């Protein structure tokens, strides 16, 4: 029994970390990170579900919204203040909030996240 446990642990240790941990959904990212400010409007963050505030942001589009969330904007820190999130998870969180505010955005792809990261890295926090 002990040797089976050792083999199992050794096998798990050899897997990439991304295989061991499932990525969060947009709703999970919102609940665990974004809701701290976006549920109450802390620091003038647009409140989840506020179609008037989010409507303006939705019109800007994901090519502006996601890079801003990745690099940080105004009082919002980069990655929503949680550097353990992946770029794809941040994008999912943004899309979850934008869709609750009237957007109709689809699930992002890894290619989308890579493109948005490149744009975020090219810009500065504003």
Where are these regions (language model features)?
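Conserved amphipathic alpha-helical interaction elements at protein-protein interfaces in regulatory
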Residues: 43, 75, 99-103
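Bacterial N-terminal signal peptides that target proteins for export
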Residues: 1-8
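N-terminal signal peptide c-region/cleavage motif recognized by signal peptidases
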Residues: 16-21
